[in-house]
Amino acid sequence: MPAAKGWLVNTVVDKVKKMVPAYHLPRAVSFKRALRMGAGLGVTRHPVTLDDVAVLQYTGGTTGLAKGAMLTHGNLVANMQQVRACMSQLGDDGHPLIKEGQEVMIAPLPLYHIYAFTANCMCMMVSGNHNVLITNPRDIGGFIKELKQWQFSGLLGLNTLFVALLDHPDFKSLDFSHLKITNSGGTALVKATAERWKAVTGCAIGEGYGLTENLASGQYQPLRRPVAPGYRGHPGAGYGDESRR
């Protein structure tokens, strides 16, 4: 049944909804073929250190072809713990604002991008929180329909997505009583968007700064303090901050 379901979903997405653009990848090996090729092979364990490369994270934010940034095991672990420290900020009750294993985080951005890869895939994993993956965030009506099923406490997005949600007539009917954190990244946050979001949801949008080359969260705003659009926040735990001209 899983194989039949997968075939049905792929067929609808590709042939009916036409969501897959035409492409050609020379010498490409499909994921299913790779699984078949490796089915009879054993696992060879290789010792690794924190300085060994764990991920080739590709970025289009460069001249020419997309380039893969080499991220080490130590880089991934350190960044997860830095974000974990940020989420451990205390509320008025003396307890962490973001509670491990109890939060529902909405993940509408692609996990192949460094922002969602770090914040959702890596950092929610280490904190034991639940990610809700939004498969097609461009379908704003479907996005909002999915949000209605959850008492979500966090949402990561970017300016254009926030505007699209705010402009939809059904967005205001959502329950925002559990929303503790909204974060914007990838592009600049417009002041008018931040003000509209705060007025509708009651939750201010935080911003940060990071690079693909060192993972996404180099600097971020405190969770409890009022935020000002354009302010990138403080360096994360263990980070240095130096401005050069």
Give short role names for the model-derived ranges.
Residues 1, 67-70, 107, 130-136, ...:
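Short beta-strand->loop structural element characteristic of the AMP-binding/adenylate-forming
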Residues 1-50:
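ANL superfamily adenylate-forming
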Residues 4, 8, 19-20, 129, ...:
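Gly/Ser/Thr-rich phosphate-binding loop
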Residues 45, 54-81:
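Conserved AMP-binding A3 loop
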Residues 53, 59-62, 105, 111, ...:
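Conserved S/T- and glycine-rich ATP-binding loop of Class I adenylate-forming
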Residues 77-104, 112-153, 168:
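Conserved AMP-binding/adenylation subdomain of ANL enzymes
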Residues 242-245:
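Conserved beta-loop-beta connector loops within the AMP-binding
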